[in-house]
Amino acid sequence: MSQADLLDQDPVFQLKGSMLAVTILELAHNDLARLERQLADKVAQAPNFFRDTPLVMALDKLPEGEGRLDLPALLEVCRRHGLRTLAIRAGREEDIAAAQALDLPVLPPSGARERPLDIKDSAPRKPAEEPSPSAGEARPEPAKAEEKPAEPVSRPTKVVKTPVRGGMQIYAAGGDLIVLAAVSPGAELLADGNIHVYGPMRGRALAGVKGDATARIFCQQLAAELVSIAGNYKVAEDLRRSPQWGKAVHVSLSGDVLNITRL
């Protein structure tokens, strides 16, 4: 076997699944001038959050009758404010065609991935008929299955005992995340369930990243760059206005509003 053959057998890449936190900008109106002004206000509040932020542009909630969307101009508005569009989420043919012309990936509309199963099977077989009882013969009543109460679903918990340094990202897939030390600025905590930080929380904490609105965040000292539950977030500039800044807090979601209460 030649050296070239040996090199061909040595893989040069791997395909891996990953759960990444990506911001979704859900466009509510086709008004780029107003979008520019409102984005500028947001960037002024949290410039670090918007610097080179990966983004999915959601166009599937745009109301009908607002005219054709200028997608290249929309992407340029986002680019000027530090948002890097990775893909769009759209359902209208004209938006999909515009994205394809820009070689931009298109994701299905919100909820389109969850469809009822289309079972194309033959008609169900009829159960075999039981012989009818003879006259005077009592038919035995079928025994009732004993109903057992549903067991509570336990979620796996990931426990981190060492400080989480800036630049580190820790993700608890399918469950809760518990950190028994400090979380530095620039660090990122993600969990499908709840997040508990038994120390100063100075980085980012994103709970319920797969959409669990019942997820909570608990920390001993709120000094976070960002807290988020099911995609609803507050950045440091918003958090500092809270009287709970620097204190032990509990963060929960009510509708689309984050509530921060003292522990």
From Swiss-Prot:
Region (Disordered): 107-159
Basic and acidic residues: compositionally biased ranges: 112-129, 138-150
Any single GO BP term: cell morphogenesis
InterPro entries assigned: CAP/MinC_C, MinC, MinC_C_sf, MinC_N, Septum_form_inhib_MinC_C
One Pfam family named in its UniProt record: MinC_C
Alphabetic keyword roster: Cell cycle, Cell division, Septation
Gene3D superfamilies in the record: 2.160.20.70, 3.30.70.260
Superkingdom: Bacteria
Matching NCBIfam families: minC
Function: Cell division inhibitor that blocks the formation of polar Z ring septums. Rapidly oscillates between the poles of the cell to destabilize FtsZ filaments that have formed before they mature into polar Z rings. Prevents FtsZ polymerization.
UniProt xrefs under HAMAP family: MinC
Subunit comment: Interacts with MinD and FtsZ.
Family the entry assigns: Belongs to the MinC family.
Name by which UniProt lists this protein: Probable septum site-determining protein MinC
Species this protein is from: Pseudomonas aeruginosa (strain ATCC 15692 / DSM 22644 / CIP 104116 / JCM 14847 / LMG 12228 / 1C / PRS 101 / PAO1)
Recorded name of the encoding gene: minC
